[in-house]
Amino acid sequence: MAKQVLLVDDSEFMRNLLREILEEEFEIADEAENGVEAVEMYKEYDPDLVMMDIVMPIRDGIEATSEIKEFDAGAHIIMCTSIGQEEKMKKAVKAGADGYITKPFQKPSVMDAISDVLTA
């Protein structure tokens, strides 16, 4: 059975791009547009992996990561961030992020990050 991934990004374009990259090897559990939805969907689906944008409305990826990790310390979360967001990445790691990819990204970097997180 394929591992389930929850895609979290306020940009439909970015969610679609991640879906295209991942759908051959993973099952997409669902998609969320903000951190509030991400936490709710995580609790509903219990996915193997979350691909989480950092900057989102309502609740950002850092806050959502922290809340998911409080609920499930073993959750695997990879942050998706833009170049120049180093300070936010440091906060995301403190919140419990397991890895990150930088936008714009290509399939090899996404798959490498996932492999690193899921085999750690």
From Swiss-Prot:
GO BP, sorted A to Z: chemotaxis; phosphorelay signal transduction system
Superkingdom of origin: Archaea
An MF annotation (GO) of this entry: metal ion binding
Modified residues (4-aspartylphosphate): 53
GO cellular component: cytoplasm
Subunit record text: Interacts with CheA.
Protein name: Chemotaxis protein CheY
Species in which this protein is naturally found: Halobacterium salinarum (strain ATCC 29341 / DSM 671 / R1)
